[in-house]
Design a protein with these regions (language model features):
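A hydrophobic, small-residue-rich beta->alpha segment in the mid-to-C-terminal subdomain
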Residues: 128-132
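Short cysteine clusters
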Residues: 125
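Cell wall/extracellular polymer interaction/catalysis modules
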Residues: 1-120, 134-187
Length: 187
């Protein structure tokens, strides 16, 4: 998925790049926005954006807590001192809202000369590649549908969703690369 906004602004600013870190999945939704398209999206919330008891799945804490200790407890040990892993926490604290993981109806050719081609930047969400037929308007390929199907088969969109920046390579990210990144000692 592409976590870059069309503005390229920092992640703590509305419509800026998608922040790295931990989000909570809050089900699936269908957007009415023309450029997002009809494929189901994954609804996400950040810490502090919503009730803390819900985000941390802990009914014993204050619903309005902004204590970073709770967020830090979700991170693997090698990420507890890695500043980018806290972007979602600080973006939520700054008032950032409404970040979802969605597809797109935009033509990849609009961004042919960009390093993120064939993906489309958004207004701050996570964008997944989809291809649509110019004549029929029907969807021909959807990585978003594959993502939704995978989340659904894994138990549904109720859990944590982790955003990490791998690199700018022009190739698909493999599961091995993700696990390597998560297990890498970052100091």
């Amino acid at each position: 998925q592409l976590a870059r906004s069309i503005s390229g602004l920092p992640s703590y600013i509305k419509n800026g790049n998608t922040p790295q870190g931990i989000f909570r999945m809050d089900g699936l939704g269908k957007s009415q926005a023309e450029f997002i398209g009809p494929t189901l999206n994954i609804q996400l919330t950040m810490p502090v954006e919503y009730d803390a008891r819900h985000f941390y799945k802990d009914s014993t804490i204050d619903s309005l807590t902004t204590d970073i200790t709770f967020y830090k407890s979700l991170l693997p040990d090698n990420y507890k001192n890695y500043d980018p892993a806290f972007e979602a926490y600080y973006a939520g604290l700054s008032g950032r809202t409404e970040i979802i993981a969605h597809g797109t109806t935009l033509k990849p050719s609009y961004y042919f000369s960009e390093k993120f081609y064939p993906y489309s930047p958004t207004l701050g969400c996570l964008s997944t590649l989809e291809l649509w037929n110019d004549n029929s308007g029907l969807r021909e390929m959807s990585d978003q549908q594959k993502l939704v199907d995978a989340v659904t088969s894994a138990g549904g969109a109720d859990g944590y969703y982790i955003v990490i920046d791998i690199d700018d390579s022009q190739k698909p990210v493999t599961a091995d690369e993700v696990f390597l990144k998560l297990n890498k000692q970052i100091l």
